[in-house]
């Protein structure tokens, strides 16, 4: 996986990628970045058709500032990917955010995710009217760990006409 908004990616290339996405409205593109500052810097140069969903990774409170960079874009759907969630995210400002995805880390040496962190994010989404999607608990065997939270799965997504 790569990051379209990496500093080494020229604006002209980003504009070409957006042009392709603009020309294919039958597809929904979920673009995810960790570089919210660069996103905020170049967003005004891009054509944001409704099929381009923009998101930022927010894995712990050290990077909560990324939400502000996302919020300032003209994307029609704005989302947070809190995966892997490696710490609590208290007091998020979810104004202008449409969707939050939460998941634990998987692989050989995953850092544990606390249920309390997930429940707090879910509560914050409810307060702000934001769709909440719980992807997985993570771990060395993510299928075995599953994706059930409070006795059910959480699959809310924005509906775009």
PLM regions and their residue ranges:
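Auxiliary Fe-S-binding modules of radical SAM enzymes
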Residues: 86, 90-161
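Core AdoMet radical
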Residues: 1-87, 98-113
């Amino acid at each position: 996986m790569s990051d379209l908004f990496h500093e080494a990616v020229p604006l002209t290339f980003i504009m070409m990628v957006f042009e392709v996405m603009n020309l294919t409205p039958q597809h929904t593109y979920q673009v995810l970045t960790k570089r919210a500052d660069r996103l905020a810097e170049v967003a005004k140069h891009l054509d944001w058709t409704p099929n381009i969903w923009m998101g930022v990774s927010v894995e712990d409170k050290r990077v909560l500032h990324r939400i502000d960079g996302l919020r300032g874009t003209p994307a029609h759907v704005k989302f947070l990917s809190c995966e892997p969630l490696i710490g609590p995210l208290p007091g998020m400002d979810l104004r202008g955010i449409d969707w939050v995805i939460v998941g634990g880390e998987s692989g050989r040496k995953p850092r544990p995710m606390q249920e309390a962190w997930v429940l707090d994010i879910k509560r914050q989404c409810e307060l702000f009217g934001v769709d909440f999607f719980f992807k997985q608990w993570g771990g060395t065997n993510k299928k075995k760990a599953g994706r059930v939270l409070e006795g059910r799965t959480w699959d809310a997504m924005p509906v775009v006409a």
